[in-house]
From Swiss-Prot:
One of its GO terms (molecular function) is phosphatidate cytidylyltransferase activity. Pathway: Phospholipid metabolism; CDP-diacylglycerol biosynthesis; CDP-diacylglycerol from sn-glycerol 3-phosphate: step 3/3. This is Phosphatidate cytidylyltransferase. PANTHER family: PHOSPHATIDATE CYTIDYLYLTRANSFERASE. The gene is cdsA.
Length: 227
């Protein structure tokens, strides 16, 4: 029998999912347009994302100079690398694929965790994350990447991304790193007693909550892209 507190928790989770969907309806088309057809908009979005992440990082870590300084390094780097990659027209599908991977792993990990449940991934850092969610998210992200490669006019010059087998493997690796990046931010939020880094994005929290995965994945993407 579900208690009143349990019912309230389920209702809150349901509302959160609806808000995530609504946010996605706005954010996803905006980024697709920016990446594929209007490069200046992507630059603006990256600047806004970077500013938002830095602002929320400061609000979270201002009491600790070492952690504050870490943010001044690890946030500008991925923003700069993604912006640099996007300057080359031939990389537009690479950037598009990248966001498909890091966003799909987050969504499918949540769905997989709620569906299959099971052992917790890191109960002290992020109590809601499960091993089943991680596996579901990583494999789904790899599948999404392969399916995306069949879109008409899809083309990535890099061999490792154009080969379907390598694409699946690399996408799974990026998805796994994205989850590690998410856990890193979750650890910091626990350390500094913060539930969400902000509230600007409905259903997600702050900019840092939504884009935390780029911190570790963007450098990896850049490295693979120049091989």
């Amino acid at each position: 029998m579900i208690t009143q507190k349990g019912k309230e928790h389920l209702a809150k989770d349901k509302q959160n999912i609806y808000l995530r969907i609504l946010s996605g309806i706005v954010l996803v088309p905006l980024f697709v347009i920016a990446i594929l057809w209007f490069k200046p908009l992507f630059y603006i979005l990256m600047i806004l994302v970077g500013m938002g992440m830095l602002s929320e990082w400061y609000n979270m870590t201002y009491s600790s100079i070492p952690y504050l300084l870490i943010g001044l390094i690890i946030i500008p780097i991925p923003i700069s690398l993604l912006t640099f990659l996007s300057m080359e027209d031939t990389n537009r599908w690479l950037i598009m694929l990248y966001f498909c991977i890091i966003w799909s792993v987050d969504s499918f990990a949540m769905i997989g965790g709620k569906t299959f449940k099971g052992a917790k991934l890191a109960p002290k850092i992020s109590p809601k994350k499960t091993w089943s969610g991680l596996v579901t998210g990583v494999l789904s992200a790899g599948l999404v990447a392969v399916l995306a490669s069949f879109i008409p006019n899809f083309h990535i010059e890099n061999y490792y991304f154009s080969n379907k087998i390598y694409l699946f493997i690399i996408s799974c690796i990026l998805a796994l790193i994205a989850q590690s990046s998410d856990l890193f931010i979750s650890y910091l939020k626990r350390k500094f007693n913060i539930k969400d880094s902000g509230h600007i994005i409905p259903g997600h929290g702050g900019v840092l909550d939504r884009f935390d995965s780029i911190i570790l994945t963007a450098p990896v993407l850049f490295f693979i892209s120049i091989l």
